[in-house]
Amino acid sequence: MRNVSLRQLRTVEAVCRLGKINLAAEALGLTGPALTLQIQHLERDTGVALFDRTRGGMVPTAYGLAFLEAARAVEDSLAALEDSIGAISGLRTGRLRLGVVSTGKYFAPQLIAAFRDQVPAVEINLFIGNRAEIIAKLRDHEIDIALMGRPPRDFEVRAQVFGDHPLVFIAPAGHPLAGVLEISRERIAREQFLVREKGSGTRISLEIFLSDTPHELEELGTEIASNETIKQAVIAGLGIAFISAHTIEQEVKLGRLVILDVIDTPIRRQWFTVSRLDRAATPAMQAFEQFVLSSGARYLPVVSKPYPANAFG
């Protein structure tokens, strides 16, 4: 195993990621036969099959997945080495792959811009996705840091709080419950809901909140995979929604949406910076984490009672 080369590891990673020899070869600047030969030599030298050849493409075996994990760990180490060399030279440089859950896209651009003003030499690659997608990318070494709500529990991470994340019920202006005080869970559960897709952190929080009522989310309403579409659907009168307060500041101020006074809300979750515990933080990661922990909260909209029109301070 000590003779496995970086080129071979990158070959395995490309085939795992793209699933087809021709696509992996194109990504690596090789011909298909040359890449196939590399895989065959590696399988011969290690004595294990790295891929199952199927009609749908190349599917990694358990051995192939182990090589994939090693390849990504090596790439992480090389990136850390590059950043460390820059840090030793007195340069605040490096690359940061940042994952942000979709709710965070309403404040992440301002936060990133402020960080870049302080550390302009750090290159940031941003990925936006739902909770499940962000966790998968963090697990697979495809992002360095995630900005998200509840940290994952199925692998060890380093999680640090940087701000509050309130979740609220919203309705269109003029809804019968607008202005009603202390709405019960049982009453709100009788409404037609517009809910996020499975895997969304907001949906998980709503399921927990309504868990002691005799209702299932599938019975309550329509599933929509976009906060923007949910907001527009609520404004159009298609139902109510449970959503991050960070996504509705402008609509509430303009009077297009109202926040409902449901008992025990806002539900105050927290925002975290999350990274893998088994990964040494690069200087770029350290600089970004320090910035977010010290200044990130100021970029979060602040929601407070009373309801509904002046909910944002």
Curated annotation (Swiss-Prot):
Q: Does the keyword Aminoacyl-tRNA synthetase apply?
A: no
Gene3D superfamilies per the record? Periplasmic binding protein-like II, Winged helix-like DNA-binding domain superfamily/Winged helix DNA-binding domain
Q: Which UniProt keywords apply?
A: Activator, DNA-binding, Plasmid, Transcription, Transcription regulation
Please name one Pfam family that this protein belongs to.
Answer: LysR_substrate
Residue ranges of every copy of the HTH lysR-type domain listed in the record:
1-61
Q: Which GO terms describe its molecular function?
A: DNA-binding transcription factor activity; transcription cis-regulatory region binding
The UniProt annotation gives the DNA-binding region as 21-40
Tell me the InterPro entries matching this sequence: LysR_subst-bd (IPR005119), Tscrpt_reg_HTH_LysR (IPR000847), WH-like_DNA-bd_sf (IPR036388), WH_DNA-bd_sf (IPR036390)
Give start-end ranges for the coiled-coil region(s): none
Superkingdom is: Bacteria
Record-stated family: Belongs to the LysR transcriptional regulatory family.
The role this protein plays is:
Transcriptional activator for the cbb operon for RuBisCO and other Calvin cycle genes.
What is the designated name of this protein?
A: HTH-type transcriptional regulator CbbR
